Amino acid sequence: FIESGYDWDGGGVDIWNSFADAFASTANYLTSIDKNPWSFDTTWGREVLPPKNILDFYDSLKQNNPKGCSSVKSRSIPKKLSEWSKLGFTDINSNDLPNRDDLEARLIAPDGINGRMFIVYQNYKNILYYNCSSYYAVSIGLLSDEIIK
């Protein structure tokens, strides 16, 4: 993270005492991740409502031999966003998800099958590179949604 330091306020890079530098450095880090940098065309994810029959297929969504921290391992297998719609997932307001075949998404349920569920995209994984906690990544995502409003 130190290598991604960014001087936002003109006083030299100081991620410890300058909020501006700390936030700018974090953004710089997220946009410089080698494999899949931050995508400005896609959000982090969205809260979803599962179909009533989710218990019938929930276990089939789990990854085989996942690698990474527990938050990366707990994500579902990837599916196109349109496939999640076909399974019966909707947004939090019971509206259809966007019909996109070009967007790969995964399901997360940080509090288990009876808790809130989210469909997440690559930007969510990038947040996990910074801090590998589902609670942290979802909190950052939800906060960013509110800031955008």
Segments predicted by a language model, with ranges:
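Alpha-helical segment that forms one wall of the substrate-binding/catalytic cleft
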Residues: 1-39, 94, 98-99, 104-112
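Surface-exposed loop/turn and secondary-structure junction residues enriched for glycine/proline
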Residues: 4, 9, 19, 41-43, ...
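Helix-loop elements that line ligand-binding/catalytic pockets
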Residues: 16, 20-83
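C-terminal soluble interaction/assembly domains
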Residues: 58-149
